[in-house]
């Protein structure tokens, strides 16, 4: 039975990427060594790192003045590293979910040590993060404005580039490469690579170099973006295998036609699942329709059918649907529609939903 992987992360990977990665595990770039054991200082991996950074820029049409880093530590480390490098007096945030909450928490911890302020402009916590706040103004007297573009747990997404003179910092862990973005509007974009780029273990940072070096506090080398830029992401041993797989994924994106093609594919997948939810007699969505994520579709049973949730979870699993259980803070179900998920998988899930509904 074919399995359909809707897991929220680590993400589904394309079969061609997996086959290439499997081959490299036995013989990487003709070295006779596994990519899992090759030295990161070898010229073969140096070429991988360089190509990965350059292709990242190419896919997003990154202008001059930006650098791409592949680091360890995940987005969770960036929650502290970003304010450590950028926050001088004040940073502004909007709180749209768990990961934004964590970013705010770590920024506040940083200010407790080094001074500065954290201002939360708006929050959707009052309705369990089921919408994106819109009634706020981005101040111009802050060092930067931070937001999380896609909220995997709650299924909301900010699919626009804010137009402001204030420096923009975005956590794009779960929707990077899912749509075109105007990189010139951002000063720093970061995220874990395990949603839309590769396996867990790598973290990407896209940073405008002229925003760095402006804080007067001492920075540990491992948390200093300028050190990592100077060392081409190899100040310490990088996540070799995740970077290799990320490169193969980005090559596949390029072969498909780039980010605009990926966006069309993602919109088509999202339309399928949301149409099924909206037309259902037993399922309903959990967030404001205008704020729906094209990466993570969250839904629950309508109140009168709540007792069927466990039955549907078992039924869907028996039909090959993997990873559709919703986060414990929301409940219900979540279908993650990351770039590598084929539309056939979404069609299969919709068929399963309709089959189950017909029984009840």
From Swiss-Prot:
Binding site for L-glutamate: 41
InterPro entries (alphabetical): Aminotrans_V_dom, Aminotrans_V_PyrdxlP_BS, Pser_aminoTfrase, PyrdxlP-dep_Trfase, PyrdxlP-dep_Trfase_major, PyrdxlP-dep_Trfase_small
Domain of life: Bacteria
A Pfam family per the record: Aminotran_5
Cofactor details (free text): Binds 1 pyridoxal phosphate per subunit.
Oligomer status and interactors: Homodimer.
Family statement drawn from the similarity comment of this UniProt entry: Belongs to the class-V pyridoxal-phosphate-dependent aminotransferase family. SerC subfamily.
GO CC, one annotated term: cytoplasm
Pathway(s) where this gene product acts: Amino-acid biosynthesis; L-serine biosynthesis; L-serine from 3-phospho-D-glycerate: step 2/3; Cofactor biosynthesis; pyridoxine 5'-phosphate biosynthesis; pyridoxine 5'-phosphate from D-erythrose 4-phosphate: step 3/5
Disulfide bond entries: none
Function: Catalyzes the reversible conversion of 3-phosphohydroxypyruvate to phosphoserine and of 3-hydroxy-2-oxo-4-phosphonooxybutanoate to phosphohydroxythreonine.
N6-(pyridoxal phosphate)lysine: residues carrying this PTM: 195
Name of the encoding gene: serC
The protein, known as: Phosphoserine aminotransferase
Compartment list: Cytoplasm
Residues binding pyridoxal 5'-phosphate, per UniProt: 75-76, 99, 152, 171, 194, 236-237
Molecular function per GO: O-phospho-L-serine:2-oxoglutarate aminotransferase activity; pyridoxal phosphate binding
Keyword Transferase: yes
Principal localisation: cytoplasm
EC top class named in words: transferase
Catalytic activity: O-phospho-L-serine + 2-oxoglutarate = 3-phosphooxypyruvate + L-glutamate; 4-(phosphooxy)-L-threonine + 2-oxoglutarate = (R)-3-hydroxy-2-oxo-4-phosphooxybutanoate + L-glutamate
Keywords: Amino-acid biosynthesis, Aminotransferase, Cytoplasm, Pyridoxal phosphate, Pyridoxine biosynthesis, Serine biosynthesis, Transferase
A biological-process GO annotation: pyridoxine biosynthetic process
């Amino acid at each position: 039975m074919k399995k359909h992987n809707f897991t929220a992360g680590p993400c589904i990977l394309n079969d061609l990427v997996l086959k290439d990665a499997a081959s490299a595990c036995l013989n990487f770039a003709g070295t006779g060594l596994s990519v899992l054991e090759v030295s990161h200082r070898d010229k073969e991996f140096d070429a991988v790192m360089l190509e990965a950074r350059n292709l990242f820029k190419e896919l997003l049409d990154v202008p001059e003045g930006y650098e791409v880093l592949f680091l360890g530590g995940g987005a969770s480390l960036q929650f502290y590293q970003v304010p450590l490098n950028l926050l001088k007096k004040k940073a502004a945030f909007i709180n749209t979910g768990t990961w934004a909450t964590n970013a705010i928490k770590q920024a506040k911890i940083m200010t407790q040590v080094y001074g500065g302020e954290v201002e939360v402009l708006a929050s959707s916590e009052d309705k369990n993060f089921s919408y994106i706040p819109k009634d706020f103004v981005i101040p111009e007297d802050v060092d930067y404005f931070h937001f999380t573009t896609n909220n995997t747990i709650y299924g909301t997404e900010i699919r626009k580039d804010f137009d402001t003179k204030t420096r923009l910092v975005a956590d794009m862990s779960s929707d990077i490469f899912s749509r075109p973005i105007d990189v010139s509007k951002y000063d720093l974009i970061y995220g874990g690579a395990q949603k839309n780029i590769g396996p867990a273990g790598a973290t990407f940072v896209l940073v405008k170099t002229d925003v760095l070096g402006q804080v007067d506090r001492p920075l540990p080398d491992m948390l200093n973006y300028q050190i990592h830029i100077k060392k081409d992401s190899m100040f310490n041993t990088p996540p070799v295998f995740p970077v290799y797989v990320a490169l193969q994924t980005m090559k596949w994106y390029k072969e498909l036609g780039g980010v605009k093609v990926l966006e069309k594919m993602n919109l088509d997948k999202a339309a399928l699942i949301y149409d099924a939810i909206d037309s259902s007699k037993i399922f309903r969505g959990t967030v404001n329709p205008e704020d729906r994520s094209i990466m993570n579709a969250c839904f629950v049973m309508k109140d009168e059918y709540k007792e069927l949730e466990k039955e549907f979870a078992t039924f869907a699993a028996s039909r090959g649907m993997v990873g559709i259980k919703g986060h414990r803070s929301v409940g219900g179900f979540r279908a993650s529609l990351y770039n590598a998920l084929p539309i056939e998988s979404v069609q299969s899930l919709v068929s399963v939903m309709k089959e189950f509904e017909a029984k009840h």
